[in-house]
Structures are given as C-alpha cells and as structure tokens.
Amino acid sequence: MKVSYISWAESCSRSDHTARELGGRSHMVYLPQFGSRAATIVFKYAGQWRMTARILREERPDAVFVMTPPVFAALPAFWYAWRRGARVVLDAHTAAFLHPRWKRFQWLQRMLCRRAATTLIHNQHQAALVEAMGAHATLVLDVPIIYPSVEPFARPATPVIAAVCSFNYDEPIAEILEAAAQVPEVHFFMTGNPKHLAPELKARMPANVTLTGFLSDEAYAGLVCGADAVMTLTTRDHTMLRAAYEAIYQGTPVIVSDWTLLRAAFDDGAVHVNNTAAAIAGAVRRVATNGEALRAGARRARDRKLQRWTQTRSAIAARLVVTSGGSLLGEKGKVRS
C-alpha cells in the first residue's frame, strides 16, 4: 500500500522520519510568502490545498497521513480519500488541542478524528481526548531519528549545551539566559530564528551564548550529536519535546522540563528541571560533571525506544489493515509502497 505524508509546514522532522519508517514519502506543503496573517491566511491555505491535491493526484496513495495543526490540511486528504477509497491518518500534535489558535476549531478536529482510520497522538492525556471524541487513537511517543548526513561540529574546549528553541510563548527563554550567566564555564548554542527573540533579552545576552540562527539539517545534526546535552524546555504541560527524543536517538543526554509526561518519556539519560534559572544552572553543572553516566543512560533509553517503536509501527499497520481490509506489511515490517 502506497503512503503519502502531508505537512502544511516549512519543515517537520517528525513527519519526515515517520514517513521514512512507514516506507512513504513526506511532503512539506508551505507558501511562506503569505505569512500567517489574518488578511492572507485564506489565500495561503487555498494555495496549499491546491498543492496537496496535486501531490495526491500524482502519487495516488492508498493511505494519506496528515499533520495537524493546521486542521484544514486534512480537508483535501479526506476529499481525495472519499473519491479514491483511500484511508486518512491524522498526526495530531499538542498544539492541535492546546494552542489558543486551534481551540476554536475543536469541532472540526473532532469530526475529522472520528472519520480517520486512526489519530497518532503523542501522550496519554491527548489519547484520552481523542477517544472521548469517539475516535481511534494510536499512541506514538516518538519516532526513530536517523540523520542521513552529519556535519562535524567544531566545539569549543568548554562543555557545550545545545539549547533548542523556537522562541515560542511556552519557552522559558529569560530563565535559560539567566542560567547561562550563572555558568560562564559552559557554552550555550541557542537555535531558532533570532528575530523572534525579545529585544530586551537580546540586549542582555551573556557572552557564553551563541545564537546559531537557521541551521541546515546537517549542521543541526552535528550540534545535537556533538553537544554534551540538548536542552529543550516548556512551561506547557502535556507537551512532547521533539528535540529531546531527537537527542536521545543520537545517544545525547537531555535537560527537559519537570512534567509528568516528560519524566515518563525521558526516564534515563535526562535531567529534569522546574524551569527556574537556578534549576537550569544546576542541571547544566550536573551535565558538566556527570556527562559519561548521563550519556550511558541516553544510550539505554535509545535502545528501549527502538524496541517500543517496532511495536508501535506494527499497531499502525494493523489498524490500517482493519480499516482497509488489505495487507499492508512488507517483508521488513514497513507499510508497502
């Protein structure tokens, strides 16, 4: 069975790696020239709808996986499925349920979840939300990350923390910078577009923090693999941190926020913090002094995650078999292409 994976986004490694694991193709469908302003969003989505329709018409997949949000990305997939007898699987990220912009469209998310073969969900809390809608949920905590090419990272002589950020509203950026100032012996490489960083924070940037700006996939992979730890934090509960499992799959320790979800997801090779500057600085010092033990823990966690993904992939394929009546598994356990 042929699989296409649609994401209305500039980039999404989760979509790319999930598509790869299922033997399908990942497509980033995005028109950046329209931005995300209210005055232009209709034109942007209309253009992306046409692009999606063209991809599906050319590939003619038997199963279409769609990342939400935006929930509207699923509409052309369902239209195609209705006409071709295909199956649709939603990959619902945390923002699909919790972001203020998308809460007003929960009625549409609910309707589409109920019509999908299954909805891929990142944690038990959101799985319960989907099941309460009368829909089928498949728990996918994370997906194996394999970097096809890694650019060597020219690390300084000091310990290195890769602070993976997007400067979103749920990231404690001020606390991270304050913590960096408390551990001048450690260098922080902070990813993300600096234009989204508040000017007052940029004005008091510690000397041991480097804003990397945009990184190519190869350079980002080099940073994740070469750092002593990857730090990714959120003030929002029930949020899975993609950068953290990207790091664990490379055997790199992580510093993550102290939420129940993240304690369960990263139970080895990880330091959990309460998002205060003092706690973050303490976690960084722990990485600097106990790096080898944490790295061994990250490798153990990676092995367990790989085993769990094998089971999850089989569950997704089995669900598609049930809803399509066909055999989807190839010889290597991947969805047929």
What are the residue ranges of the model-derived segments?
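A short, histidine- and acid-enriched strand-loop-helix "catalytic/donor-clamping" loop
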Residues: 35, 86-103, 117-118, 147
